[in-house]
Regions:
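Core alpha/beta structural scaffold of self-assembling particle/tube/pore-forming proteins
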Residues: 2-305
Length: 305
């Protein structure tokens, strides 16, 4: 039950991220890759007081082992599961964690990874504010699919710090491009694809909520990041303000059922019943999760550089 919940939540987070750090498919092999994701969130405008997390594949830790000494040396007699998964309590402003429940997926099958915006999408705050999603029509594509979790970039659209409204520059002084994550699989038809992405690019003249330096324009080149039909398992970086997890209280099946609520608010239905023919007694646990996206631009997919 817990494993299924972790996998489902990780998939939801992967698809609903708005940020990207690193080159798609490049392994994280240095702590600078982790710190870079933290720098991305700080530059975007994530509050410095927020806890920031970097969730990585267990094998990634082997690449970082040489730099691990002393990062988490303090150890009590009893440690929680969270503490056991923790690699570093604060590295580059990030809490680095390891997880075997990261979501992997196969990228879309289209080998044509470049297209053009057929028309300028709606980039107003009023349209995006409730979902932080945006619809774009991409043309001049080939055939195949664009998969949920694939990320796109639009030429000439770069990120702003949402607090200062200043252009974000990376370590080399280059502008950081805006990235959107495709929310559901799309089949290309007639060389066109209509995609809905998380982390909408918002731009209005003198707009107080702008998060990019220019609105996506008709004819702008759209790049689908990564290679076609390739298995990816991105690391995740995020803050507590990015996503929410709750549960739905399930009705009892019989009067003898129990609906328990954990200390952190998780509702679990417990049903106890018997199989007379098999002479066995069984207990069933049911949990119905509910996920929410608070701000996709406070989370991202992480790779190496």
């Amino acid at each position: 039950l817990v494993t299924d919940l972790e996998l489902d939540l990780a998939k939801f987070m992967r698809i609903n991220t708005g940020l990207n750090y690193g080159a798609r498919g490049t392994a994280v092999d240095a702590w600078s890759d982790v710190a870079g994701a933290g720098a991305m969130m700080d530059s975007v405008g994530v509050p410095m007081s927020d806890n920031k997390y970097y969730l990585m594949n267990p094998f990634t830790t082997t690449s970082l082992a040489s730099a691990q000494s002393g990062l988490n040396a303090a150890d009590g007699l009893v440690r929680t599961a969270f503490e056991k998964a923790q690699i570093a309590s604060n590295f580059g402003g990030m809490k680095a964690l390891t997880s075997n429940a990261l979501s992997s997926y196969t990228s879309g099958s289209t080998t044509d990874r470049l297209g053009d915006l057929k028309a300028a999408p709606d980039a107003t705050y009023v349209t995006a504010k409730d979902t932080m999603q945006q619809t774009m029509v991409i043309e001049t594509l080939g055939t195949g699919t664009i998969e949920a979790g694939d990320q796109i970039q639009v030429a000439g659209v770069n990120r702003l710090n949402i607090a200062t409204r200043q252009l974000i520059l990376d370590a080399t002084g280059a502008a950081v491009p805006w990235t959107g994550t495709v929310l559901s699989v799309v089949t290309i038809a007639g060389n066109e694809a209509t995609v809905v992405v998380s982390g909408a690019a918002i731009y209005e003249a003198n707009g107080q909520y702008n998060n990019v330096d220019a609105a996506p324009a008709a004819g702008a080149v759209v790049t689908i990041l990564g290679a076609a039909a390739t298995v990816y398992q991105p690391n995740l970086f995020y803050t507590e303000q990015a996503f929410g997890l709750g549960t739905v209280k399930l009705p009892k099946l019989y009067s003898t059922d129990t609906v328990a609520t954990t200390s952190d608010g998780m509702s679990i239905r417990v049903s106890k019943y018997s199989d007379g023919d098999a002479n066995t007694q069984k207990i069933r646990f049911d949990l119905l999760p509910a996920y929410a996206v608070f701000n996709p631009n406070f989370a991202g997919q992480g790779y190496g550089v």
